[in-house]
């Protein structure tokens, strides 16, 4: 078996199973695929080979994952229900739910947004190749939100240029741990890839420019949780998650960047499920061929509504 890369991760936070930790730290791989790699002897903890996916990890331990070269993927249409908000001959706008991976990768050969798009939408751009037809931008697996899809290569190139030149408009609703003091603020700090954990990012002066604006919508003082409206001016990977973690306010549910399950009531934790409390609810862009400004918004998914309702009901 040929190895394409070797990744190292440092365990932070609460005790967790090895397979669950790696599936969260390396979201491109499904948990079942991670289990397979562990059993094949491709995972080491503190320098020792571990073949037991249920092995409990503790804070400070180091995990090394040997990633095998990917096999060619056969991406097929699948009748996965998705909400298509808008569609014309050039674009489609869809609502991606929490838990749905955007495109196939090793361990995620089916059950992705791309599989759903191939079934529901006749034509998709080919610039992204077999694995990413129509995909112009991404949302994390644990994040719900609105996405624009390109149906031809002309639209694809135009939309990619808009994202690169920051001509799009992106707003999020976010629940973070802790009481954010200022009603309005901006986080203007560069973001770089973590030198050890290559799937994570952190604030570093030598990183790429990243600007995040935020407005406080409500503070739930009893539980030390803040609801924010957030606008990102740059599109760095994990930008909102990294920026708020850097000021001591991790996104609820985001254990990769410092959220601790013990910091919220168990009842609230169960309502959150596997989702990060982060919604890409607003997307604005220029139509790639007509040039008109278009804005699309979605309502909060049921998971988020349940969390909001619980906080409202249990707050004084």
UniProtKB/Swiss-Prot annotation:
PROSITE patterns, A to Z: PSI_RLU (PS01129), S4 (PS50889)
CDD domains, A to Z: PseudoU_synth_RluA_like (cd02869), S4 (cd00165)
GO biological process: enzyme-directed rRNA pseudouridine synthesis
GO molecular function, one term: RNA binding
Record-linked InterPro entries: PsdUridine_synth_cat_dom_sf, PsdUridine_synth_RluA-like_CS, PsdUridine_synth_RluC/D, PsdUridine_synth_RsuA/RluA, RluA_PseudoU_synthase, S4_RNA-bd, S4_RNA-bd_sf
Domain S4 RNA-binding per the UniProt entry, residue ranges: 16-89
EC number(s) from the headed UniProt entry: 5.4.99.-
Reactions accelerated catalytically: a uridine in RNA = a pseudouridine in RNA
Domain of life: Bacteria
One Pfam family here: PseudoU_synth_2
Keyword entries, A-Z: Isomerase, RNA-binding
Residues annotated as the enzyme's active site: 140
Family recorded in the similarity comment: Belongs to the pseudouridine synthase RluA family.
NCBIfam families noted in UniProt: rluA_subfam (TIGR00005)
Name of the protein in question: Uncharacterized RNA pseudouridine synthase aq_1758
Taxonomic lineage of the native organism: Bacteria, Pseudomonadati, Aquificota, Aquificia, Aquificales
